[in-house]
Amino acid sequence: MESNHKSGDGLSGTQKEAALRALIQRTGYSLVQENGQRKYGGPPPGWDAAPPERGCEIFIGKLPRDLFEDELIPLCEKIGKIYEMRMMMDFNGNNRGYAFVTFSNKLEAKNAIKQLNNYEIRNGRLLGVCASVDNCRLFVGGIPKTKKREEILSEMKKVTEGVVDVIVYPSAADKTKNRGFAFVEYESHRAAAMARRKLLPGRIQLWGHPIAVDWAEPEVEVDEDTMSSVKILYVRNLMLSTSEEMIEKEFNNIKPGAVERVKKIRDYAFVHFSNREDAVEAMKALNGKVLDGSPIEVTLAKPVDKDSYVRYTRGTGGRGTMLQGEYTYSLGQVYDPTTTYLGAPVFYAPQAYAAIPSLHFPATKGHLSNRAIIRAPSVRGAAGVRGLGGRGYLAYTGLGRGYQVKGDKREDKLYDILPGMELTPMNPVTLKPQGIKLAPQILEEICQKNNWGQPVYQLHSAIGQDQRQLFLYKITIPALASQNPAIHPFTPPKLSAYVDEAKTYAAEYTLQTLGIPTDGGDAGTMATAAAVATAFPGYAVPNATAPVSAAQLKQAVTLGQDLAAYTTYEVYPTFAVTARGDGYGAF
């Protein structure tokens, strides 16, 4: 055990050094600090087998900052054999609020999640525990829409190593074009992390275009027992003009009367079957078939548990619903700037960003026969999922908005259609005065005029002191990021209770940082300046009406990042974890 007393073992001079040395003396495990984390075991003493398979690692969050392995290891040992624990550490010797624990098998990991989630580790301090995901997928934005999958795959293999596959989705409006982004799959998390570091904006361009790169939402893994009971199909790559009736007819052709109902959202749909056998048969028969001029992809919908890793990662949240019904669908949604004139969000289902809005449908047809569904301006994300015992159906994840049928306490959203009412078609844009533009629209127009590229919004989430989910958007402007790679993304200093408010606030903050005044901008700038004076002496916020220099821009964006980190560290037990923390830029 002498090696454990060397200066490089991560223990000398640390907090609770005596307790930690007693722990490794008792267990025989090694404890070494490297790359901002302290690793216990991996492998444990006497381990001669291969490392545990994927799915054996759990994420433990909401750790008290002064809690260390001497308290956490004995707790985990009661559940199963620990292969490895990795605790993230800061420069002050405290933990960063979370750790990863790998058990010897999946059953132990599953039991650990059940037993340790919401476990009171100290008086009033509850742990947040969920499955960890070994993310191997990157999101790459800014790709020319005319490029094909084979071209993108070839280009990514030229600039990065370990590329396994590229996922490209056709445009909802024009199937001959892509959506301007792709998902790149790598052979390992390490390969993906190294590629992400290499592809940071400003370092590499694709076809002469600046690109935006970030972690994609990890693919949700569902156990076989749960998937064996699924009888709902997810159908994507539909034409916008394809109707629910057409989809139902096509799937009923496999077995008449097998389909219970169909729900289509823009270019994807969920098809409900009365039994699983019919669903599987239809999936095998229709996957890849051309429907209404477009080849469709058909898969089983994936149930999402309320305690899944998705809830704890940086992008969780969104706009949800409260209707009591049979199913909850998690809808992948991305706002398409090419259709802003419609005044409404555009729905499709790429595996893009990480918000998970929900849409509920009743268990029986005709439930809404005398109701009008009116779009809800905002509602707590995943509320409906929690209300239904934590089960939803996942197509893919993305950001955007949900639709509420009922249950929003902010104001009534449903009204009866009364006799004599006339429903008049109209453009939603006409509902607002034409002279007033929201901050996201202003930011988009400015980026277009200056050829900066489309702003990329990244949704993040944190849990407030009252256990309320809060949201924050980070904004990356491709051209500015390529010119000043060290100062992106634009990170506002405050979180919002609603996703739409967070997006507007992020756009306002970005405009103010760029020196462009917005409605209420003076007050926001003054508030920011006050926060700066209190928390970060020496920082200065650029005048909102004066031209902004590169130095001011860098200083202001750095300030925003520091303020966000300060707020998160001091107030909110955040779960801004995108993947593993092995020192390769995963966070």
Swiss-Prot record:
Cellular compartments annotated: Nucleus; Endoplasmic reticulum; Cytoplasm
Self-association state and partner proteins as the record states: Part of the apolipoprotein B mRNA editing complex with APOBEC1. Interacts with TNPO2; TNPO2 may be responsible for transport of A1CF into the nucleus. Interacts with SYNCRIP. Interacts with CELF2/CUGBP2. Interacts with RBM47.
Gene: A1CF
GO molecular function, a single term: single-stranded RNA binding
Record text about domains: The RRM domains are necessary but not sufficient for binding to APOB mRNA. Additional residues in the pre-RRM and C-terminal regions are required for RNA-binding and for complementing APOBEC1 activity.
Role description: Essential component of the apolipoprotein B mRNA editing enzyme complex which is responsible for the postranscriptional editing of a CAA codon for Gln to a UAA codon for stop in APOB mRNA. Binds to APOB mRNA and is probably responsible for docking the catalytic subunit, APOBEC1, to the mRNA to allow it to deaminate its target cytosine. The complex also seems to protect the edited APOB mRNA from nonsense-mediated decay.
Source species: Pongo abelii
Protein's UniProt keywords contain Cytoplasm: yes
Main location: nucleus
A single GO BP: protein stabilization
GO CC annotations, alphabetized: apolipoprotein B mRNA editing enzyme complex; cytoplasm; endoplasmic reticulum
SMART domains per UniProt: RRM (SM00360)
NCBIfam families per record: hnRNP-R-Q (TIGR01648)
Annotated segments matching region Required for nuclear localization: 360-409
Annotated RRM domain residues: 56-134, 136-218, 231-303
Name under which the protein is recorded: APOBEC1 complementation factor
Domain of life: Eukaryota
Keywords: Cytoplasm, Endoplasmic reticulum, mRNA processing, Nucleus, Phosphoprotein, Repeat, RNA-binding
Residues of the signal peptide: none
Residue numbers bearing the Phosphothreonine modification: 491
